[in-house]
Design a protein with these regions (language model features):
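Post-signal-peptide, soluble extracytosolic/periplasmic N-terminal scaffold domains
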Residues: 5-13, 20-22, 30, 36, ...
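C-terminal functional regions that serve as terminal interaction/effector modules
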Residues: 136, 173-196, 202, 211-219, ...
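Short Pro-Gly-centered beta-turn/loop motif in secreted/extracellular proteins
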Residues: 33-47, 51-54, 116-139, 199-218
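Short, acidic Ser/Thr/Gly-rich low-complexity loop/linker segments typical of extracellular
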Residues: 18-35, 102-119, 187-200
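Solvent-exposed strand-loop boundary residues in beta-sheet-rich modules
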Residues: 18-22, 52-54, 87, 101-105, ...
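A short, amphipathic beta-strand motif
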Residues: 1-6, 78-87, 164-173
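Short, structured motif recognition centered on aromatic/hydrophobic residues
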Residues: 10-17, 46-48, 74-79, 91-100, ...
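Structured interaction patches on ligand/partner-binding surfaces of diverse proteins
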Residues: 33, 52-75, 136-161, 217-240
Length: 240
């Protein structure tokens, strides 16, 4: 790794390509994932590509008739990401991360990696990134701008303001929920966020105000509710 000159002992993939002199594409020769690979090559010019996670570098080497040793530097660092609501870690099954690099003025211009789970070690080229954390599958999304530094491991926690709500259509508060109810969750402005069907479907929502519509047996019922971060709750609509 650049800066500290520490040898990388795992996570490497080496690929060797013959470097042709006639203008034809480089030809793959050998591959290894050893930290200190030894390649037996005929004399000639070669392109060495070293991949370290999502970062990598390429170097041209010329092999003679005697043994030679090459050292290649990679400008890379790493991230470990986690997410929380309040003081509680979010279960791995309910959150995932995506990493972007900016293109022009768009901080999420190009996707670098997605479907990243908490605690995973993500090796990246040195640079600035937008990390997006998605909690659940509705609108609980938060982001952070992080800088990957040479030979550094950055551990980041993204904090969500969200909660789980369970929707119910009932005759009386605390009563049995109607099966087969169609629910629509909307913003106060009337934009649909999510449609669900069932007696008591659950979803994760960002903190804020919402409007709920329940349809059952040809009848329509409505209600307003508020989501407070970290406070899971049942949202009951009275069928009357």
């Amino acid at each position: 790794l650049e800066t500290d000159r520490a040898m990388i002992r795992d996570g490497l993939v080496w690929r060797i390509y013959a470097d042709p002199t006639d203008g034809t594409p480089a030809r793959f020769v050998q591959q290894s994932d050893a930290a200190l690979p030894v390649f037996h090559l005929a004399p000639g010019a070669y392109i060495v590509h070293a991949a370290y996670g999502l970062s990598g570098t390429t170097q041209r080497v010329v092999v003679g008739s005697s043994a030679a040793k090459e050292t290649i530097s990679i400008s890379a660092g790493a991230l470990i990401l986690n997410a929380m609501v309040g003081d509680s870690p979010i279960p791995d099954s309910k959150v995932q991360f995506s990493i972007f690099v900016a293109v022009g003025t768009d901080p999420e211009g190009r996707l670098v990696a997605d479907n990243i789970k908490p605690g995973a070690l993500i090796r990246l080229p040195v640079g600035s990134y937008r990390v997006v954390s998605t909690y659940g599958d509705t609108n609980a999304i938060t982001s952070a701008d992080l800088t990957v530094e040479p030979a550094k491991l950055i551990k980041a926690i993204l904090r969500h303001r969200a909660a789980t709500v369970t929707l119910k259509l009932v005759n009386n508060l605390g009563g049995e929920a109607y099966a087969g109810t169609n629910f629509s969750v909307l913003t106060p402005g009337g934009d649909t966020i999510r449609d669900l069907v069932g007696a008591f479907p659950s979803l994760i929502l960002a903190e804020g105000d919402y409007f709920l519509i329940a349809r059952n047996n040809g009848k329509v019922f409505t209600s307003e509710f508020k989501v407070r971060s970290g406070i899971d709750q049942d949202i009951e609509i009275l069928a009357r």
